[in-house]
């Protein structure tokens, strides 16, 4: 699966496994992924169906506000055919409250907590991507964080202590 894992930019909305199995997969990976001092600061939100498409619509609307018209049109078209057209999106977060608690518990290593958090999140993203590949899904990793973090948090009532790290749209590769 590791050798087959790559970025797929043309996806379609076809479930290759039951969505409940994807939820179970997320739970399994979160439970087994190494974290600094077992702080378990990673948080994951799975968006499917209309929620998935709505999230990518929020990205498009955020880009509309900042891009010149010709760049916006190209970006919108890319998002529509590459990300929004897929089956779902995995949102990766880090819980800043949990990380701050770790800093307080381990003051000698407080300066390393952010680095460890990034390393742990990277392992989580890689494990998720590889596992989705095992199911036959294609995926890519996106970083529209600062453009959409507030609107996503507001729309889906995301804990304000959670910091958005990445978005992983997935679907059947075309």
Listing of model-derived features with the role each one plays in the protein:
Residues 84-93, 99-100:
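Short coil-to-beta-strand
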Residues 64-67, 80-82, 155-174:
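A glycine-rich helix N-cap at a beta->alpha junction
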Residues 51-53, 96-99:
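A short acidic, glycine/proline-enriched capping/turn motif at secondary-structure boundaries
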Residues 1-88:
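N-terminal amphipathic, basic helical "cap/leader" segment at the start of enzyme domains
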Residues 28-30, 90, 96, 106-154:
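Small-aliphatic-rich amphipathic alpha-helix that forms the alpha element of a beta-alpha
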Residues 58-61, 102-107:
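Short, flexible, mixed-charge acidic loops at enzyme active sites
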